[in-house]
Structure formats: C-alpha cells, structure tokens
Design a protein with these regions (language model features):
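Short, solvent-exposed mixed-charge patches
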Residues: 131-132
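Central antiparallel beta-sheet cores of small beta-barrel/beta-sandwich binding domains
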Residues: 22-23, 29-31, 35-94, 102
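Positively charged n-region of N-terminal signal peptides that target proteins for export
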Residues: 1-4
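N-terminal helix-cap/turn-to-beta initiation motif at the start of protein domains
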Residues: 17-25, 123
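Short, exposed beta-strand-loop hairpins at the edges of beta-sheets
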Residues: 95-106, 112-124
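Hydrophobic h-region of N-terminal signal peptides that target proteins for export
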Residues: 10-18
Length: 132
C-alpha cells in the first residue's frame, strides 16, 4: 500500500514539474511548425525542428536579403529569454512569416505555452501545445 501511494505521489509531482518546464518540442498555434526550446548558458532559445511545408522551406521574408536563401529548418526563432518567477522574458522572437523580430515573453498556462510578441504597446499572444 505504501509503495502504491508513493508511486502515485511521485507520478503527480513529476507531472506538475514537467508541466511547468518549457524545455522540449512545441507545436505552434497554426500547427504549421514545431519549435524545440532549450536552455544554453542560462538563456532560453528555440529552433525550428519541423515545418509543414517541408525541410527545404526558405526564409524568404527575412529583412536581410542575404538570409532569404537559408533554410528555416534549424533556425533559432526564440532567443535570449531569462526565467523570472513563472515567466520567461527579456528575449526576442523571430516571425519567419513577415521576416521581423519582436520582444518576447512566455509563460505556462496549464499544459500550454503562451508565447507573446511585443512591439511597443502592441502585442500578439499565441498558444503552443507540447508535441508528443
């Protein structure tokens, strides 16, 4: 009986901790890309690891003409976020659909990740789902 209770408590604690961890693969709100979020030197970043249009999709909207021929696969679109309490902030997010980058903050909402891009007083928030 003690073993069963311990196992249930351990499973619950693991689930709670895992649900608050942004590390891993996430499906964007549109479902057309998957981003892997990882920590490096105390900063959180995210790179594209899957695209619905395929791995050869180019960064055609980049404001830097020299980067328009690069493949989006593997490109960091989240960079430099720092965890502060229950939020990750102080970083940037690149939007390959328009070639612009924005200030970024993120937070967990249950098992979903809220990703917000800021431009001055304007912002847009997306809800990303954890990939299986």
């Amino acid at each position: 009986m003690k073993r069963m209770v311990f196992s249930m408590v351990l499973a619950f604690v693991t689930m709670v901790v895992y649900s608050q961890d942004i590390k891993g693969k996430w499906i964007t709100e549109a479902g057309d890309a998957q981003v892997e979020i990882y920590e490096s030197n105390g900063k959180w970043n995210g790179k594209i690891v899957w695209l619905q249009k395929g791995p050869d999709t180019k960064d055609t909207h980049n404001s830097n003409e020299k980067l328009r021929s690069r493949k989006l696969m593997g490109v960091n679109i989240l960079f430099g976020l720092t965890k502060k309490k229950d939020k990750w902030e102080g970083g940037r997010i690149y939007n390959p659909k328009n070639g612009k980058d924005y200030k970024c903050s993120m937070w967990m909402d249950g098992d979903k990740l809220k990703v917000r891009g800021h431009l001055g007083i304007f912002y847009e928030t997306q809800t990303w789902k954890r990939a299986q």
